[in-house]
Amino acid sequence: QANDYKANADEFAGQLKDLDKKADSFTDSHKDVHALATEPVAGYLLQEMGIEDSTPEEFVTQSETDAGPSTKTVADTKALLSGKKVQLLVVNGQTTDAITDQLRSTAKTAGIPEVGVTETLPEGVDTYADFIGSTIDKISTTVK
């Protein structure tokens, strides 16, 4: 049994190295990319890919409250999209609301592409490596 654990751990470590290479490839070919996220679900992955998460801290903090972000905070956040200060909108498709819809609409009007992410493995994806790999692929094909 110990050999099985070791073999599985080695296989997983190899998959993680492949993911690092995939993320590094994006970083090498895309400089100064900024994203806005409806939720901080993909924050570590964006960082690993060299993408600056430009989501205002107030938006993140206020989004976690029952009241949600203030009108000013939403306006400031939308201004990042309409002013083309970011190149990507990252949307957690598992939790959307009216503010998410506003951000998506603003991004679409501004020509800012959107990529969907999830907090859990989507249907048809069985492994962590496939989950993260497919997210890297989606971001890579979305950001020009």
Task: Cite the ranges covered by each PLM segment.
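Extracytoplasmic metal-acquisition and chelation regions
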Residues: 1-144
